[in-house]
Amino acid sequence: MAMQMQLEANADTSVEEESFGPQPISRLEQCGINANDVKKLEEAGFHTVEAVAYAPKKELINIKGISEAKADKILAEAAKLVPMGFTTATEFHQRRSEIIQITTGSKELDKLLQGGIETGSITEMFGEFRTGKTQICHTLAVTCQLPIDRGGGEGKAMYIDTEGTFRPERLLAVAERYGLSGSDVLDNVAYARAFNTDHQTQLLYQASAMMVESRYALLIVDSATALYRTDYSGRGELSARQMHLARFLRMLLRLADEFGVAVVITNQVVAQVDGAAMFAADPKKPIGGNIIAHASTTRLYLRKGRGETRICKIYDSPCLPEAEAMFAINADGVGDAKD
């Protein structure tokens, strides 16, 4: 009798565990969805049941060969596999306490972020050139591979580079600092160069397929907005630009929700040249407007300090107080500033 209860308890926990990890799209076939329809979903970029459950019906109907009735059936089956209803704040609090934080390499910066870069959400870093945005990205691409007890995420990193600033040599220097094998670290980083805004979005579909295959802890887009500044120009194209950017950020948020990866994006700043700039203490503001502001969970403002020191300020966060921390850019990545 005790044995049976134990087995039932084990079965319950395994069901619970399954409901939290991303489930491959092939699970829908077991629920009576036609194999051809599942293939169509996969070709359209839906690689997990979660991706289907989180998608609006309109998106499924746009797939060639999926009628409204089929879309309804697919969404109904996906909803059975993915818990999307209400839960108590206690349960949610429990789930939040299990969230992994990835170290930035600087103790002061980690303290400011209450542990590091949070997985399952979008962290945006913005600032002028030479403020350390890309250096933090390079350091994170290595620290996310560390064991959890050393402040890592025990997963691979994915790096989408839009400005051609990715340097594997920097990763090797950071790997040496943490006593990791350089070749293993480089093997665990998937790198892609994005050449235009459509390509940048297309890469996220590939990212989703790769995340199903192996465990990724971090997705970096450096910089998320650079190509939007050149592909769309003038006020006439502003609305089209913001819609495209909103779609890109929505996909990033979906990847963070689906796979629990930490998404880190960098953003550039624009100088305000209107009359109001004369009265502002700092006339620079991040580009992308309200759309990027609402999509990011945590926004960090980086600025130059003296010498190699940089200052990071929490610009916007749902739970972190507005505060500042100093860090330094060293030969072996981001570290603490020396007094």
Swiss-Prot record:
Induction context: Stress-induced increase in the mitochondrial levels is seen.
Organism of this sequence: Homo sapiens
Modification type Phosphotyrosine: residues: 54
Similarity annotation: Belongs to the RecA family. RAD51 subfamily.
Changes after translation: Ubiquitinated by the SCF(FBH1) E3 ubiquitin ligase complex, regulating RAD51 subcellular location and preventing its association with DNA. Ubiquitinated by RFWD3 in response to DNA damage: ubiquitination leads to degradation by the proteasome, promoting homologous recombination. Phosphorylation of Thr-309 by CHEK1 may enhance association with chromatin at sites of DNA damage and promote DNA repair by homologous recombination. Phosphorylated at Ser-14 by PLK1, triggering phosphorylation at Thr-13 by CK2, thereby promoting interaction with TOPBP1 and recruitment to DNA damage sites during S-phase. Phosphorylation by ABL1 inhibits function.
One Pfam family it belongs to: HHH_5
NCBIfam families, A to Z: PRK04301.1, recomb_RAD51
Location of this chain's protein in the cell: Nucleus; Cytoplasm; Cytoplasm, Perinuclear region; Mitochondrion matrix
Result of changing residue 150 to Q: In BC; decreased ATPase activity in the presence of stoichiometric ss-DNA concentrations with respect to RAD51; 3 to 4-fold decrease of affinity for ATP
Domain notes: The nuclear localization may reside in the C-terminus (between 259 and 339 AA).
Protein name: DNA repair protein RAD51 homolog 1
Residues given in the record as ATP binding sites: 127-134
Modified residues (Phosphothreonine): 13, 309
Underlying gene: RAD51
Superkingdom, taxonomy of origin: Eukaryota
Phosphoserine PTM sites in chain numbering: 14
Annotated tissue distribution: Highly expressed in testis and thymus, followed by small intestine, placenta, colon, pancreas and ovary. Weakly expressed in breast.
